[in-house]
């Protein structure tokens, strides 16, 4: 059963600079998936860059995770229709948790990822449980430094 297996994926993360070229490079290098982080979309309060998502998806044959700028169900829809295989939410999950449920109900929980920043979250294990209840199919854990305490948290979340 997949939930009981421990496996690793190589998922390079891209930002705005040279995203399409870098996606092609990682695709050819054997990456399992690619994550495109449009962190400026959230900071600047603008919509996700759907055109870049479309360009990347047209250039590679591995799944793409679209991250950043998601505030509405319409944003999730646009990213998925542009070719993203999954959409990742961080701020949206914190500010509007019902969006996670709406997106999972409409598009399937396997297409919804929520991010937990271990350096910002006071109760990552509890928050992970809440995100699962809301419908997140996967969790993306972020950290500044990999320290032993974070590995204990990862083990607890995995259980």
Indicate residue ranges for each PLM-predicted region:
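Conserved N-terminal beta1-alpha1 strand-loop-helix module at the mouth
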Residues: 1-62, 73-74, 109-114, 118-149
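Hydrophobic, well-structured mid-protein blocks that either form specific transmembrane helices
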Residues: 79-120
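Short amphipathic alpha-helical segments and helix-helix/interface helices
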Residues: 23, 53-54, 100-104, 128, ...
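Catalytic cores of alpha/beta
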Residues: 57-87, 128-129, 152-159
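Short secondary-structure transition/capping segments
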Residues: 46-49, 76-79, 99-103, 152
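Short, surface-exposed, charge-dense and proline/glycine-enriched linear segments
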Residues: 64-71, 97-99, 120-121
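Short beta->alpha connector loops at strand-helix junctions that form conserved
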Residues: 68, 89-92, 142
